[in-house]
Structure formats: structure tokens, C-alpha cells
Curated annotation (Swiss-Prot):
Protein name: FNIP repeat-containing protein DDB_G0289381
Biased composition (Basic and acidic residues): 20-33
Organism of provenance: Dictyostelium discoideum (Social amoeba)
InterPro entries: FNIP, STK_FNIP-Repeat
Positions with biased composition (Basic residues): 1-11
Length: 846
């Protein structure tokens, strides 16, 4: 790959004063005839060399230059000279470095590379890390994944000293030798199959986070040195069930989580006082005495069939997930608990004023039953009873604002609920002998999740079933009742019907103030003209997987030629005020979609199965449309898109010509299959995203003339270079031609990490722009390289870069010899890197 470098900056004589330097450089920059290539960054670097007595004037010059070129502007920490003596030596040293724009840009550059190497979905493996040539790039990588067949031994493939996190794959199950893991590692995550005995010295003394996999079930203690003292987070897998004694857990652990099968007795002092988050799972069934739970625990999750003793839960606890004997209420739960979640069913016969549900909690999650089945949090009860029970007065405190209740056999009377505090209510109902009424729900409730079970025998949601205070309504997955007119609250703004709803909407069944509607995966009913078209406040609507009915937005007449389309729908069935139309990712929608010119829609998102051509079946005639997102399978010509569109996102199957893009387009995203020429892109385009892993090999930005020139250059290069070098030169030349003519400010190609991760940032201003080009390549999974391109560009850079001054002949371009030996190429890269690092640390420390 051909490397691009900075153009050499001209030197200035010492006889010139700083203001004269600045003035001359500005005049040379503004004069296009002198052929000078001075850019704004060069001028700015010289302004930093002015004398102290001219500091005030210098700040004004800097501000003036920064206003002309925002690409190189930074925030200065200005201070008065009289106050300079008040700063400490460290502060003066910091300001002297921070004010140097060159050093500051270098710092941000290294920060960007660090983010590029670590903000990835798939961590780099140890094999890939050892193939990276440059030591600088190795230091940037902080996360490494150990595969199944990789050996982590000092003599064959050591782990570098800069690694901070190790992730072992699920297949890894090999012993680890002492001293193999460096002291720089602070986090280790083992895979599911790891079940090896850990001995002293195998884990580094600096380790802070340790997470075991599902199958791990070995004795590990702090007293014998298996677990380091520095541990702050310790997480065991589901199979772990070893005895816990005193001093087994390191004294600095703050988060301790046990797995599903852990069921060992605990005594006071076994868990260190440093623990603030403690979790046990369903199989834990041990008595808790005073002091067993540390006094500093704030987050506690516990299961136990033994009675909860007074004082067993410390006063420091604020969040409690309790799966024990829930029928005790909150008699022995401290007042400090603000968020309470019961994980098993509660028999309301035992809930009295003395056993009320939390005296001070603001959030409660519980399952109310008469011993019936059901659970509010996924823990099922097998006992059954036909007795209908109700909440008793004052059994739930008046301070609760977030309440979750599962009612299995009968509704509660609202006088037993906190009527003046509950604003968020999740209500589950099943075997009701009476239809749902608004008297079951507090009048202060604004957000309601109504989960009606399959055993609910009523078929309709009657009028005034929900109080008028509700503004956000969500139905559960089993809801499939006919919504009668005026049954929903008049102030309702958003509604989610759930995945089970598939009933036709009736006229006046939805309130006029509603602005957001979401249908579930089962809904596939035709929408009549008089149901939603008059909803003047509706701005967003989303359809699920099964929906495949015609949609018309606007006052036009649709051309219905599809046999699957209901011929009764001829006019607009969606309101013109709609701003966003979305189909779920797995949507099967293929019917008519017609958007008239009077529509106010701005955003459309299609599902993955949509692949219809833009004709009478799909007509986008609106003038306000700004964004379209197509799914994975869309691959149709795009010749009739509205000119108002500013953002286009295509899926991985799209591979059509993009010659006729909207002239106002600012953002374009192309999938992995796209291999067309990027020609005639709109001048308004700012952001371009490409996901094709062969992007560098398919660069076809240039026009025919440039292609002919490239062919001639290739013939000359064939005499001295091999075919691989010619391909790299072609790619670089094509990329240069593209950069010369484009107005794009940002290009992203975030492909798979095993193939290509390519980011280009281009920030344009009046006369100058900065181009940053980072390329992370793992070619054929056996070679890794990170290359940085920095170009300082002005208007005449590509046209006059070979000329010294007007009237002089262009200087001869010196062709860099590309060494054929791979080792020579690596040495050149390493030497250039060492040169840059030397100057960086020189300016930083001296």
C-alpha cells in the first residue's frame, strides 16, 4: 500500500519577526499565482513562536486564523500575565504543552488509534496480536482473546505486558502456568468449559475482575494465594458449589455473584465487609443470621425458604430482590430498601397492616395470588387454589410509585392500593370472573402495562376500562381483545398492542390525541379510511412481522392492481401528519405503499424482506421525505426517489447503479455486496459508509481519463514492480482522484475486523482541509498493519503540488522505490514510527 506523507514545510529566517512571518504567510496563501503551498496549519504553528511581550496580539491573531479555519482550532486556556505567578509549576508545564497545537493534535491522534484498536466487537486473538509488526500498535491493543488451540506459554507465544483484559473462548480448558499472565492484566473472563485447578501465582497480583464460566467448580481461596488481594469483582458460574470459609474471599471484593447451583452454609464474617453487591440464585436455601450479609451491602438478591430473621438484611441495603418466604411481607425488611422485587407468589391472606409491603419503598414488584400459579419475575409456583383473595387495607405503603402486580384469580379493590403515589403500574390479570374496570387502577397512574392472560374469558375491552390519567399504554403478548369505541382514555398519547393482537380497529376506538402506535407481529388487518386518517396528532406508526396490507398517505387515489390488496381501500388510510413509518426487521410487507405530495412524512424504514420496485406499487411522491432505510434483501433501481431525501441506507444485497441520487443527499450507506462505480455523487454528500470487505480492490472513483492514465502508469510500473505493487498503486491513485473531486467530509468502512476496518475523516473549510485516514487490515488472517495518512490540502494542492513558483517548470517527481523484500518494508515502517515517537516524547517531556 502506497504511503502518503506531509508536504515539507518551508523554513523561515530568524531575522523575520513573528508578526512579519504571519503577515507574509497569509499573503502567500491568498495569492494563487505564487504557487506556495502554505496551509493554515503551517501559519498557526508559527504564530505559537511569538515573544512574550506580543502575547496579547498573538492571541488575537490566533483567534482570527481559527475563525478562518476551524479544522485546526483548539480551545486555549487564556490567563492574565499578572495571574501567571499564581499557577503551580505543574500547571504552567501543562499549559505550555497544551497550547502547542502540534502536540495536541498528536495526542488526539494517538487517542483515536487507541479507540480504533479497542472499540471492536470481536477482540483480537493472540495469534493476530503477535503478527502485528509495529511495537506501537501492539501497545494500543488492550484486549486479547485466547482461542481453543492457543498455548499461552512464555517460550512459545507470550502475552505482551501491555494487555489489560483476557477473554478465553468457550472451548478453552487447559492449565495455566504460573507467571504466564503478565501483571498488566486487570480483567480475566473464562469460557464455559474451563474447569482447571488454579494454583498460587497463576493469576496476576494486579487482577481486579475475575469471571468464571459455567462448568468451573474448583476450590479457590485467598488465604492460600489462588485469588489475589487486588480483586474487586468475583463472579462464579452455574456449576460452582464449593465450601466458603473465612478469608476465602479477598478482602477488597465489592461485587460477589454466585451461580445457580451454589448452596453452601454461610456464617458471619465469611463474606468480607467490602462487598456492596451480593447475589444468590434460586437453588440457594440456607438460613441467614445477623452478620451473614455484610453491613455495607447495597444491592442484594437472595433466595431462601427459611424465615427472614429481624436484622438479617443490613440497614445499608437499598435494592432487594427477594425470592424467599414472600408471605411475610416486609415485616423484617429494613426501611432503607427503596426498590423491592418479590420473586415468588404472595398469598394475600397473610398480608395485613402489620405485614405490609414495604414501609418506605418507592418501587415494588410482586405476584398477588391466593396460592395460585404465576410469577411476576419468572419464578413459577406449582400450588393451586380456587379461593379468591384480595389485598388488605394498608398492605402496600403510600410512598410506592412503581408497582408490578400479577393478579391470578381476582382484582384488587383500588382502596387497598396507594392511590396518590403510583404512576407506573404493571398489572397482570388472568382468571377474572368480572371484566376489567377502571376502579382496579389508581387514578394517578400515567404509564400502564396491562398483561391479560390466556384464561381471561372476556372478549372485549369495554368502555372506561382504563382511567383517563393513563397517557402511555402497553398490552402484553396474550392480549387479543376487540377494542370498543371510547374504551381507551381520551388523553392517551402512545399505545403498544403487543405481539398477540390481531383485531380490526373500529371507528373511534382510538383517541384523537394519540401520536404513537405500535402493532405486534400478529397484526394483519386492513386499515379502514375512517380509523386513522383523521388522527391529526399521529406522528409515528410501526408494523410487525405479519402485516401486509395496502397503505396510502395523502389524499390521492391508489392504483390497486395487486390481488392481495383489499379493493375497498382506495383513499388515504393514514393521516398526512404522519412523520415516521417503520416496518419491523422481519416484516413481510410487500403490498401497496403510496405516499402523496401533501404528506408530511419524513422517515421510512423497511424490513429485510422488502424488495419492491419504485412504480405504481411503491410510489413516493412526497416532498418532505428526509430519510429511507432499506432492508437486507432490497436490490431494485433507485431512479424515482424524492429530491428532498438527505439520508439513504441500503442493505447488504443492494448492488444497483447510484448515478441518479437525490441532489440534496448528505449521508449514504452501502452494504457488503455493493461494487458499482462511485461516480456522479451529489455535491451535498457529507458522509459515506461502505461495508464491502473488498473496498480497496474495487475503488472505481475515477473517470475514464483517469482510468486511461492509470493503465499507462501500470504498464510503466510493470517493468520495475510486481503485480501486487501495481494493484496497490492503482488503488491509491484512484483514491487520490476521488479525494480531489469529492466534497465528502467523512468516509467509514467498518467491515469485519478480520478483513478491513477503514475510516476516513475529511473536514473541509474555506481554503484548507484536514484528511485523516486510518486503515486496519488483517489480510487473509495472517498479517496485521495499521497505517495513518495525514494530508494538508488546499485548493491548488493536487493541481500545483509539483510546481515551486509561477513561471518555473514543475519539479521532477521522485518515485519512491518500493522494496520487494517484505522485511525491508517493515524496517521502513518501524524507522518512520520511531522517528515520530522520538519527537513526540521530546516535546512532551522537554
Amino acid at each position: 500500500m502506497k504511503l502518503l506523507s506531509f508536504k515539507k514545510k518551508p523554513s523561515l529566517t530568524k531575522s523575520q519577526s513573528c508578526p512579519d512571518k504571519l503577515k507574509n504567510l497569509k499573503e502567500q496563501q491568498k495569492d494563487p499565482k505564487n504557487g506556495a503551498n502554505y496551509d493554515t496549519a503551517t501559519i498557526k504553528s508559527y504564530t505559537l513562536q511569538q515573544h512574550q511581550q506580543q502575547q496579547q496580539q498573538q492571541r488575537e491573531d490566533n483567534n482570527m486564523i481559527n475563525n478562518e479555519n476551524e479544522d485546526f482550532s483548539f480551545n486555549y486556556f487564556d490567563y492574565d500575565e499578572d495571574q501567571e505567578s499564581t499557577y503551580s509549576r505543574e500547571e504552567r508545564l501543562f499549559f505550555s504543552i497544551w497550547r502547542n497545537n502540534k502536540i495536541k493534535r498528536c495526542i488526539f491522534h494517538h487517542l483515536e488509534i487507541f479507540n480504533l484498536m479497542n472499540n471492536i466487537n470481536d477482540p483480537i486473538t493472540l495469534d493476530q496480536l503477535n503478527l502485528i509488526d509495529s511495537g506501537k500498535l501492539r501497545d494500543y491493543c488492550k484486549i486479547v482473546k485466547i482461542e481453543k488451540n492457543e498455548k499461552i506459554e512464555l517460550q512459545c507465544m507470550p502475552i505482551p505486558n501491555h494487555i489489560e483484559k483476557l477473554i478465553f473462548s468457550n472451548e478453552f480448558d487447559k492449565p495455566i502456568k504460573a507467571g504466564t499472565i503478565p501483571q498488566s492484566v486487570v480483567e480475566i473472563e473464562f469460557g464455559e468449559k474451563f474447569n482447571q485447578v488454579l494454583k498460587q501465582g497463576q493469576l496476576p497480583p494486579s487482577l481486579e475482575i475475575l469471571k468464571f464460566g459455567k462448568r468451573f467448580n474448583q476450590m479457590v481461596t485467598h488465604s492460600t494465594g489462588e485469588l489475589p488481594t487486588s480483586l474487586t469483582t468475583l463472579i462464579f458460574g452455574n456449576n460452582f458449589d464449593q465450601i466458603i470459609l473465612k478469608n476465602f474471599i479477598p478482602p477488597n471484593v465489592s461485587t460477589l455473584i454466585f451461580g445457580l447451583n451454589f448452596d453452601q452454609p454461610l456464617s458471619p464474617g465469611y463474606i468480607p465487609s467490602s462487598v456492596t453487591k451480593l447475589e444468590f440464585q434460586e437453588n440457594f436455601n440456607q438460613p441467614l443470621t445477623i452478620g451473614t450479609i455484610p453491613k455495607n451491602v447495597k444491592h442484594l438478591k437472595i433466595f431462601s425458604k427459611f424465615p427472614l430473621n429481624q436484622g438479617a438484611i443490613p440497614q445499608s441495603c437499598t435494592t432487594l430482590y427477594y425470592g424467599g418466604d414472600c408471605n411475610q411481607g416486609t415485616k423484617n425488611i429494613p426501611d432503607s430498601v427503596k426498590s423491592l422485587h418479590f420473586l415468588q407468589s404472595i398469598d394475600c391472606n397473610n398480608l395485613t397492616k402489620e405485614r405490609s409491603l414495604s414501609k418506605s419503598s418507592s418501587s415494588i414488584s410482586l405476584d398477588i395470588s391466593g396460592g395460585g400459579s404465576g410469577s411476576g419475575s419468572g419464578v413459577n409456583s406449582t400450588t393451586t387454589s380456587e379461593k379468591i383473595t384480595f389485598l388488605q387495607p394498608e398492605s402496600i405503603c403510600k410512598s410506592v410509585t412503581n408497582l408490578t402486580i400479577e393478579l391470578n384469580q381476582g382484582p384488587p379493590n383500588k382502596k387497598y392500593l396507594p392511590m396518590n403515589s403510583v404512576t407506573q403500574l404493571s398489572l397482570g390479570i388472568n382468571e377474572f370472573k368480572k371484566p376489567l374496570k377502571s376502579s382496579y387502577i389508581p387514578n394517578c397512574c400515567t404509564s400502564l402495562l396491562l398483561n391479560i392472560g390466556p384464561d381471561y374469558k372476556f372478549q372485549q375491552l369495554l368502555s372506561k376500562s382504563i382511567p383517563s390519567s393513563v397517557t402511555a399504554l402497553q398490552f402484553g403478548p396474550n392480549f387479543n381483545l376487540t377494542i370498543m369505541p371510547n374504551s381507551l382514555p381520551i388523553h392517551l398519547r402512545s399505545i403498544d398492542f403487543g405481539d398477540g393482537f390481531n383485531q380490526q380497529l373500529l371507528q373511534n376506538s382510538l383517541p384523537t390525541l394519540i401520536d404513537s402506535i405500535k402493532f405486534g407481529n400478529s397484526y394483519n388487518q386492513p386499515i379502514s379510511n375512517n380509523v386513522l386518517s383523521n388522527s391529526n396528532y399521529l406522528t409515528s406508526i410501526e408494523f410487525g412481522k405479519s402485516f401486509d396490507q395496502p397503505l396510502i398517505i395523502g389524499n390521492g387515489i391508489g392504483n390497486l392492481n395487486n390481488n392481495n390488496i383489499n379493493n375497498n381501500v382506495t383513499n388515504s388510510n393514514l393521516p398526512i401528519t404522519l412523520n415516521k413509518l417503520k416496518f419491523s426487521k422481519d416484516s413481510n410487507f410487500k403490498s401497496l405503499l403510496k405516499i402523496e405530495s401533501d404528506s408530511m412524512i419524513e422517515e421510512i424504514e423497511f424490513g429485510d424482506q422488502y424488495n419492491e420496485e419504485f412504480n405504481n406499487q411503491c410510489s413516493l411522491g412526497c416532498t418532505h421525505l428526509l430519510s429511507i432505510k432499506f432492508g437486507e434483501n432490497f436490490n431494485q433501481p433507485i431512479n424515482n426517489l424524492p429530491i428532498s431525501i438527505k439520508k439513504l441506507i441500503f442493505g447488504n444485497s443492494f448492488n444497483q447503479s447510484i448515478k441518479n441520487l437525490p441532489e440534496n443527499l448528505t449521508s449514504l450507506s452501502l452494504g457488503t455486496s455493493f461494487s458499482q462505480n462511485l461516480i456522479n455523487l451529489p455535491n451535498s454528500l457529507i458522509e459515506l459508509k461502505m461495508f464491502n470487505k473488498d473496498f480497496l480492490n474495487n475503488l472505481n472513483f475515477s473517470n475514464n481519463n483517469n482510468e486511461n492514465n492509470n493503465e499507462n502508469n501500470n504498464e510503466n510500473n510493470n517493468e520495475n514492480n510486481n503485480e501486487n505493487n501495481n494493484e496497490n498503486n492503482n488503488n491509491t491513485n484512484s483514491f487520490n482522484d476521488f479525494i480531489k473531486n469529492t466534497t465528502i467530509k467523512r468516509i467509514k468502512v467498518p467491515c469485519l475486523i478480520t478483513t478491513l476496518n477503514f475510516i476516513v475523516e475529511k473536514n473541509k473549510s474555506k481554503n484548507c482541509s484536514l484528511l485523516k485516514f486510518y486503515c486496519f487490515v488483517v489480510a487473509n488472517n495472517n498479517y496485521t498493519n495499521l497505517v495513518k495518512y495525514n494530508l494538508l490540502l488546499n485548493k491548488s494542492y493536487f493541481e500545483k503540488w509539483s510546481k515551486k513558483k509561477e513561471g518555473q517548470s514543475p519539479r521532477k517527481q521522485r518515485k519512491k522505490k518500493i522494496p520487494t523484500d517484505q522485511r525491508s518494508t517493515k524496517l521502513l515502517l518501524v524507522r518512520k514510527f520511531l522517528y515520530q515517537v522520538f519527537f513526540f516524547f521530546f516535546f512532551f517531556f522537554f
